[in-house]
Amino acid sequence: MGIYPDEVTTFAAVVLYGAPVAVAVLSYLLGCINGAIATSHLCYHDDVRRHGSGNAGLTNFYRNYGARCAPMVIAFDMLKAVGAVLLGNYFLGYLLGWGVAGKYFAALFCVIGHMFPIFYGFKGGKGILCSGTLLLLLDWRIALVGWGVFAALWLTTRYVSLGSVAAAASFPFMTYFIFRDAVTTALGTCIALLVLWAHRSNIKRLLSGTESKFHFHVNAPKPGEDQ
């Protein structure tokens, strides 16, 4: 039995419209796997969001539990970013010809999942570790600038939030400079705005001079104990 033209057209339409939806949903679900929350449950039978700043991110995890299980947080958040970008790159970038915009599309929904995870009552992290990993996967030049800005400001001021905000702000400009593509730049701008919105309370504290600085410590406090 042969394949009729209308069947081919229907299949093409399903792929054309179904692939972006599937990538968006899967990337979002991958983003929902929060490394800080999962690791605090696995290692300490606790929820990192109950302590410190209440944020489900690496900084708050480290401040409350120390360095022993921090690599697990990093692994969780890096692997989900890799998975999302691979999905976007293959199904959108390669099969549908979106190019690098396919990776940016998946990255956006991964960040949304990280910040608003359906598994954890839509209360997630601020997206820095996840976004930082995505930078490495999207383009090494953008990653070099973003990570460079973050490291320079963090090391000189000890404000993780300041480095994060500045790196996020540079992202859409670097995206446009490298790719000169309106769609890709728009997606990059959406990611940056999400990260900046997530850091709105940090920005207020930076402006008022009440933001906490980040310092390394060797000994962790008791599991679940606020600092």
Describe these PLM feature segments.
Residues D46-L58, F119-G132, Y159-A167:
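Short, non-helical or kinked segments that cap or interrupt transmembrane helices
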Residues G18-C43:
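N-terminal signal-anchor transmembrane alpha helix
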Residues A36-S40, T59-N60, G113-K123, F150-T157, ...:
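C-terminal ends of transmembrane helices
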Residues N60-G66, G88-L92, F109, G113, ...:
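Interfacial segments of multi-pass membrane proteins
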Residues Y17, V21-V25, P71, K103-L108, ...:
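Hydrophobic alpha-helical transmembrane segments
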Residues I37-A70, K204-Q227:
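Cytosolic, membrane-interface loops and tails of multi-pass inner-membrane proteins
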Residues M1-A22, V85-F105, L136-I142, Y176-L187:
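Helix-coil boundary and interhelical linker segments in multi-pass alpha-helical membrane proteins
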Residues R63-N89:
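Multi-pass membrane catalytic core of lipid/isoprenoid biosynthesis enzymes
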